[in-house]
């Protein structure tokens, strides 16, 4: 049968599928656009499952903050070309908004929730794989909230608002003015992106990481042949420097090298007249 070009255009606008696929679908469904939509979906998901095994090494990080809660997620694609695709970017922004709405971090649970189109999030990702033509993988989700205070976020060098290759969210618990807390939270999120800490506090630093570093430092100091008391002071000093490199609260604030992050918070507590507790952060990076 001869396919109506206007029907092809309408089907393409509705699905994002290629002209050839739209013609094939309309031919197979007798020109019925609704049936053709379902046909494309069935064919597309079958193709998508084949593509979903391909390696993904690029993608985008997205941030969505809303008052006292916020979400961050990483969605991977095969190439930077797709990461710059408007349809892919819209998908990622919708996903991070839904992650914030559903307040979840578990990916399997999240994929079962409803997408804005009414389908499951899992099925929507599969549909986008079929339409875009590359594997798309939801790699990580982070979510933070506080009863009183704010969650702030930052994306470095965004490709569009709230989308980029590296981003962070920060939760500050406080009864201080939210507008001023938001400024502080964003500054700390910017610091996190620049300094890339591995833990919030010394107590939360992975014991294996600390033990390995202490062993390396001890071997270095042993070679100096110093008295035990001197060697112990050198080791303590180097461990303190290590904390300053990898622990957020011990790091030197990138916007003021006279303050650590802990000291910055104490300074803001004095200025705002309320205690401020940095309860958590999430840092996601697209790394090839």
UniProtKB/Swiss-Prot annotation:
InterPro entries: EF-Ts_dimer_sf (IPR036402), Transl_elong_EFTs/EF1B (IPR001816), Transl_elong_EFTs/EF1B_dimer (IPR014039), Transl_elong_Ts_CS (IPR018101), UBA-like_sf (IPR009060)
CC terms in the record's Gene Ontology section: cytoplasm
Domain of life from the UniProt record: Bacteria
SUPFAM superfamilies per the UniProt record, alphabetical: Elongation factor Ts (EF-Ts), dimerisation domain, UBA-like
Primary localization class, coarse: cytoplasm
Localization (cell): Cytoplasm
Keywords: Cytoplasm, Elongation factor, Protein biosynthesis
Residues covered by region (Involved in Mg(2+) ion dislocation from EF-Tu): 79-82
GO MF term set: translation elongation factor activity
Keyword set includes Glycoprotein: no
Function: Associates with the EF-Tu.GDP complex and induces the exchange of GDP to GTP. It remains bound to the aminoacyl-tRNA.EF-Tu.GTP complex up to the GTP hydrolysis stage on the ribosome.
Family listed: Belongs to the EF-Ts family.
Protein name: Elongation factor Ts
Gene from which this protein is expressed: tsf
